[in-house]
């Protein structure tokens, strides 16, 4: 189920404030955020936002196709290391 239309999309207030200030000054530098739940808005297009994945900040360039999605969707939190390999000693027996 989606969020109620009367509430509007969730965006971290500090993140939105930083984006709006950068748009006023026509600046384009990276912004660090821990807010993975923030929705991407049209005012964020063209900015690079470094989203925290639990270990480090991963930079993401925002495009028009990302609008409406959450920041956390584009930064995986888990790394797949592969399944256990075949044990050659066990295979011989």
From Swiss-Prot:
One of its GO terms (molecular function) is rRNA binding. The keyword Aminoacyl-tRNA synthetase does not apply. Keywords: Ribonucleoprotein, Ribosomal protein, RNA-binding, rRNA-binding. SUPFAM superfamilies: Ribosomal protein S19. GO terms for cellular component: cytoplasm; small ribosomal subunit. GO terms for biological process: ribosomal small subunit assembly; translation. PROSITE patterns: RIBOSOMAL_S19. It holds the Pfam family Ribosomal_S19. The keyword rRNA-binding applies. InterPro entries: Ribosomal_uS19, Ribosomal_uS19_bac-type, Ribosomal_uS19_CS, Ribosomal_uS19_SF. Protein S19 forms a complex with S13 that binds strongly to the 16S ribosomal RNA. Belongs to the universal ribosomal protein uS19 family. NCBIfam families: rpsS_bact. This is Small ribosomal subunit protein uS19. It comes from Synechococcus sp. (strain JA-3-3Ab). The gene is rpsS.
């Amino acid at each position: 189920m989606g969020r109620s239309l009367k509430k509007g999309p969730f965006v971290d207030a500090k993140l939105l404030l930083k984006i709006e200030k950068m748009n006023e000054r026509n600046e384009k530098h990276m912004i660090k955020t821990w807010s993975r739940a923030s929705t991407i808005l049209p005012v964020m297009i063209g900015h690079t936002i470094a989203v925290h994945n639990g270990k480090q900040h991963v930079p993401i360039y925002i495009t028009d196709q990302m609008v409406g999605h959450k920041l956390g969707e584009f930064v995986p939190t888990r790394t797949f290391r592969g399944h256990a390999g075949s044990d050659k000693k066990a295979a011989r027996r």
